[in-house]
A protein has these predicted regions:
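ATP-binding N-lobe of GHMP and related small-molecule kinases
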Residues: 1-117, 125-135
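Alpha/beta catalytic cores of group-transfer enzymes, especially the acyltransferase/condensing modules
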Residues: 135-141
């Protein structure tokens, strides 16, 4: 089993702060994208890996559908995954979740074009497939 998804970055042309209050904004998608790959492992625990880190973050999902980090907590990346599991109300085990945001960097410097939103969107699409939720694009928003 292998699930691959991607979501593009974004650049605001106008209305960035209006959008925060429910107003309208004009944005363009960018050629850079966040990529998520979910695959099977031979272990009972899961692991989260990211292009932004040189090590993995093993975790399990408890009976209350909360992530239990078995070593270090990956902070923001972990919170995006935790929110997805909470929203979908389903757990899983024995999976590797790889997040690649290397497109959003120039060398070691982040270029600032919506990588967090792209990770959220790509991860949501991947979890939708993994958990067989069959949500439409509109429902995932």
């Amino acid at each position: 089993m292998k699930i691959e998804t991607a979501a593009s970055g974004k650049a605001f042309l106008s209305g960035e702060y209006m959008a925060l209050d429910g107003g309208r904004a004009i944005i363009l998608s960018t050629p850079q994208s966040a990529k998520v790959l979910i695959s099977e492992t031979n272990q009972t625990n899961n692991i989260l890996v990211s292009s932004m880190s040189d090590h993995g973050y093993p975790f399990r999902i408890d009976e209350k559908l909360k992530i239990v980090w078995l070593k270090e907590n990956p902070k923001q990346l972990g919170s995006i995954l935790s929110e997805g599991i909470s929203q979908f109300n389903k757990g899983f085990s024995g999976k590797s979740i790889a997040i690649d945001t290397s497109d959003f960097f120039c060398g070691e410097r982040k270029i600032g074009i919506g990588s967090s939103a792209a990770v959220s969107a790509a991860l949501t699409k991947a979890l939708n497939k993994l958990l067989d939720l069959r949500l439409t694009s509109k429902a995932m928003i």
